[in-house]
């Protein structure tokens, strides 16, 4: 029985040690930015035994027996409230208490039955509201969890999964191979392009775009094994918003008029979340934010949110019993007529390859803060 293997690590026996350099940095920054909310989030983030995994079932090799077992063990389906968009084909289960289910091994020719993920990472996917036949771009796709989730929601006419880092690209390819049947592979393209070049390479091509941007991954950073490298990451953290803004500008170019864009990160950092979105809103005249506060009300049973000061933004933080996040989901925007961006030039960065790879590597252990940004052109503005 698969769930018999679920075990929790004994209290105090962590697989990794906390990195004091990072924790001190976060204490200083997030106490200022989040106030009392940081204290509760800190307790969860520093205690891996409290972390939870949701179980996303693969509709292309559906695990009926596992689903029965999950019900028997007290798991429940995610998003039991009525979201405006929630496809019946998307089945995700979670437990109220920390349970661990073993991940499946990759076997060539055999599709996996489920994918383990932080439940908060489904919020950007649902925010895209993917429909059958649409063209969708996952700009920073590795390790592939959100691409897999998108394919559980609908059958796109074309799914472009892009990843700039070569090591993570191999991981992405393996993930897709493990979950997607051969007939569906014909509508999926995998590329290794610098995301900042995608808008010029594929202008106004996509109905939906997901930018799950490289960021300072809070959970991963807290358990950095090398204090010197951790200090170096902290010193370079201020460069990340430049990269994120450049990726967003490129994504906007790749979005067709009337399309939708979602921006997400896995950090609580205001500079990488709210400030990035504010810069885009102030410098791009062809986008408009969309109020997503209703999603927070609908999802409050499973997630804890803190205010971002922006109607188009949601910040998910972990707390006891709702250990999902951190994840910031911000901004729904609508895109305006083509070629109407403000004249303000985008920020530039020297050494493109060097600056891009660093945050990609930091992002490798993503466990969930996301900020979402959604963009539409006024041609299909829905009030």
Residue ranges and their predicted role:
Residues 3-153, 160-182, 187-202, 241, ...:
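Glycine-rich nucleotide cofactor-binding entry segment
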Residues 59-62, 223, 353:
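Helix N-cap motif at beta-to-alpha junctions
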Residues 122, 160, 218-219, 327, ...:
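Structural detector for hydrophobic anchor residues on beta-strands
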Residues 135, 158, 258-260:
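Short glycine-centered segments of the SAM/dcSAM-binding site in methyltransferase folds
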Residues 154, 191-193, 201-250, 254-258, ...:
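Mobile active-site "lid"/loop adjacent to the S-adenosyl-L-methionine
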Residues 155, 184-186, 285, 342:
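Residue-level signal for beta-strand positions within conserved beta-sheet cores that form or flank
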Residues 262, 266-360, 368, 373-383:
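C-terminal catalytic and target-recognition region of SAM-dependent MTase-like enzymes
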């Amino acid at each position: 029985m698969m769930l018999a293997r679920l075990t929790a690590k004994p209290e105090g026996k962590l697989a990794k040690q906390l990195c004091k350099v990072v924790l001190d940095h976060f204490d200083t920054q997030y106490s200022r930015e989040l106030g009392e909310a940081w204290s509760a989030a800190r307790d969860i983030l520093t205690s891996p035994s409290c972390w939870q995994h949701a179980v996303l079932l693969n509709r292309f090799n559906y695990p009926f027996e596992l689903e029965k077992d999950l019900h028997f063990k007290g798991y429940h389906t995610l998003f039991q409230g009525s979201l405006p968009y929630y496809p019946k084909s998307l089945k995700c289960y979670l437990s109220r208490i920390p349970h661990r289910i073993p991940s499946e091994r990759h076997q060539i020719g055999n599709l996996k039955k489920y994918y383990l993920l932080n439940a908060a990472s489904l919020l950007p996917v649902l925010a895209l509201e993917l429909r059958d036949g649409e063209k969708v771009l996952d700009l920073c796709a590795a390790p592939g969890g959100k691409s897999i989730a998108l394919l559980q929601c609908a059958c796109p006419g074309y799914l472009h999964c892009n990843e700039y880092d070569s090591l993570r690209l191999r991981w992405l390819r393996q993930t897709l191979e493990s979950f997607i049947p051969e007939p569906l592979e014909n509508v999926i393209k995998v590329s290794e392009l610098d995301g900042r070049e995608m808008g010029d390479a594929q202008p106004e091509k996509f109905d939906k775009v997901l930018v799950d941007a490289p960021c300072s991954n809070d959970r991963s950073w807290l358990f950095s094994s090398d204090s010197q490298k951790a200090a170096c990451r902290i010193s370079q953290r201020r460069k990340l918003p430049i990269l994120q803004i450049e990726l967003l500008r490129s994504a906007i170019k790749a979005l067709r008029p009337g399309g939708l864009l979602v921006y997400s990160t896995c950090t609580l950092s205001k500079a990488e979340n709210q400030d990035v979105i504010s810069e885009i809103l102030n410098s791009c005249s062809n986008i408009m934010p969309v109020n997503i506060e209703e999603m927070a009300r609908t999802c409050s049973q499973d997630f804890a949110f803190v205010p971002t000061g922006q109607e188009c933004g949601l910040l998910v933080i972990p707390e006891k019993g709702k250990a999902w996040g951190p994840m910031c989901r911000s901004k729904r925007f609508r895109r305006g007529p083509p070629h109407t961006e403000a004249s303000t030039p985008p920020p530039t960065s020297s050494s493109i390859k060097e600056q891009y790879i660093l945050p990609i590597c930091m992002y490798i252990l993503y466990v969930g803060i996301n900020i979402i940004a959604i963009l539409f052109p006024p041609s299909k503005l829905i009030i």
